């Protein structure tokens, strides 16, 4: 049968001792770790690279329509002005956050 949330199954297997280690996408790993029955340590893989996909760290991005520089400026200013609040929301969901150099944010 097809799994709807394999990351949740992986996290449960980790908590239940069926796995010693798991590699998951950071936002999903953090979210599941926050809900887990036992503490789980999240370690961002910031320096590792894979053969097929390269680096494992990348930024979230937003896209806008071309030729709308004022809208782009508005969005960029909203993000910049609200970055701490955005970070707090993401932290609330357990999302591991990194600075521009790939170092974990406190």
Model-derived regions: residue spans:
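Proline/Glycine/Serine-rich low-complexity intrinsically disordered segments
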Residues: 1-106
